[in-house]
Amino acid sequence: MKEIGALQAEYPLVNKLIATKEVFWINPHIEKYERAIKDSPLNEENVKDAEERLKRFAPYIAKVFPETKGTNGIIESPLVKIPSMKEALETNYKQTILGELLLKCDSHLPISGSIKARGGIYEVLKHAEQLALQHGMLTEEDDYSILDSDTCREFFSKYSIAVGSTGNLGLSIGIMSANLGFNVTVHMSADAKEWKKSLLRSKGVNVIEYEDDYSKAVEEGRRQADADPSCYFVDDENSHDLFLGYSVAASRLQKQLEELEVVVDEDHPLFVYLPCGVGGGPGGVAFGLKLLYKDNVHCFFAEPTHSPCMLLGLMTGLHDKIAVQDIGIDNVTDADGLAVGRPSGFVGKTMEPFLSGNYTVNDEELYRLLKELADTENIYLEPSALAGMIGPVKVCKEDEYLQKQQLTEKVKKGTHIVWGTGGSMVPKDVMNEYYRKGLELTI
C-alpha cells in the first residue's frame, strides 16, 4: 500500500477525510450502463433467480411471520412522499431541492426492521432451501410453508449459521435462522447497541461480543465457522447472495413508483441516496436499480465522517486493501450500522463503474436530521438511517455532478429517494434519547 503522504498528494480529498470533514466525491470511474454491465460479475438473471426464490418462500414467511400476511409473505416497505421534510431541508440548508423528495422506509420492513431484512433473510433462506433439497425434505414445486414443522426444525438444528455484525445484519440473520431451527451465532462488534444484543438473545441466538470493531467480529466469525463443517458463515464482506437479496428491492420499488405515478426516464432522472457500511446493502440496491433504469438512475453512497471506508477504497482504487484506520481515522461513530473501517472489495469493484458518487456526514448532523424528520413527518429512524437525507441538498448545492451529466435542467423534473435503512425496532427510550440529542444540537 502507498504511504499516506503519497495518497494525500495523489488524492487531495484524503486530507479532508483525515480531518473528518464532510466531503462530496464524484466517481471519475463511472461508465455508461451498457459498457459497465459487460464486465459485471453479476447480471439480471442472478437477480431474477433471487426474486423467484423469495416468491417460493412467501407461503412460509406469511405463515411464520403474521405481520407479512398482508403482503402474502413478501417482505417489503413503504415508499412515501416527505414534502414537509423537503421544506425543512431547504430552509435549514438554504438550498432549493430541485425535484420531488421521497423516503423508502426500509426502517419499517417486517421481521427485523432494517434494510438487512432483505439480504440477510434471503441468504439464510437460500441456504435452508439448498439443505432441504439435498436431503429430500423439499422440492421446488412444494408449498414451502411445510418447512414450518417440527421435523424440519429438528433437521435444521443439526446445522449452524454464523455472522459478524454491527447489529442489523445480526438481527435479520439471527431471527430468521432461529425460526427455521438453525443454531445461530452472531459475532458482534464493540459498537453494536445493547438492545440489539438483548433482542437476539431473547430469540435464542448465541451472541459473542468483541471489544474490537466490525472487521474483527467478521474475522472471528469466519475463523470459528471454518473449524466446523456443519456451520455456514454469512460473509458480509464477500457474499454474492446477500448482495442479490438486496438487489431484489429494485423491481419492487419500480412498482411503487408506478403506483405513485412517478416517471423515470431520460428527462425525469432518479437520484437515490444510500447509507453505506461495508457496502452490501447499498451496493445490492444500487445494482438492482441500474439494471432497471440504466443511465437514468444516479446512486450515491453516504457514510459517517469517522467511517468513510467505501469512499476511501473507491477513491484510491485500493478497495479492501485499505482501512480508515490506516490513515488515522478512528472508525468511531454513533451510526452503528455504518461503523465499518474496511469496505467490501467485491462490492467496491462491482459498483465502481455504476456508482455516481459518495459523500460523508457527521454524527451531529444525523441527530439533527433525525429530529427534523420526526417533527415534520412523524417518522422515526435510527441515526445511521439518516445519512442519505442530506444527499439531495449536497447534489443540488455542489452542482458539478449535475453539470457533468447534463442534468441541470432535467433535475427539476426528477425524483430523489432517500433510503431509510432502519429504526422501527429501536426501543422507545433509546429513540427518545436520540431525539433529545437532535433537539440539543438544534437549539
Swiss-Prot record:
Protein's GO biological process: D-serine catabolic process; isoleucine biosynthetic process
Cofactor(s) required for function per UniProt: pyridoxal 5'-phosphate
Family per similarity comment: Belongs to the serine/threonine dehydratase family. DsdA subfamily.
Gene Ontology molecular function, alphabetical: D-serine ammonia-lyase activity; hydro-lyase activity; pyridoxal phosphate binding
Keywords associated with the record: Lyase, Pyridoxal phosphate
Pfam families: PALP
Listed SUPFAM superfamilies: Tryptophan synthase beta subunit-like PLP-dependent enzymes (SSF53686)
Enzyme Commission number(s): 4.3.1.18
InterPro entries: D_Ser_am_lyase, Ser/Thr_Dehydratase, Ser/Thr_deHydtase_PyrdxlP-BS, TrpB-like_PALP, TrpB-like_PALP_sf
Entries under HAMAP family matching the protein: D_Ser_dehydrat
Protein name: Probable D-serine dehydratase
Catalysis performed (reactions): D-serine = pyruvate + NH4(+)
Modification type N6-(pyridoxal phosphate)lysine: residues: 116
Domain of life from the UniProt record: Bacteria
EC supergroup of this enzyme: lyase
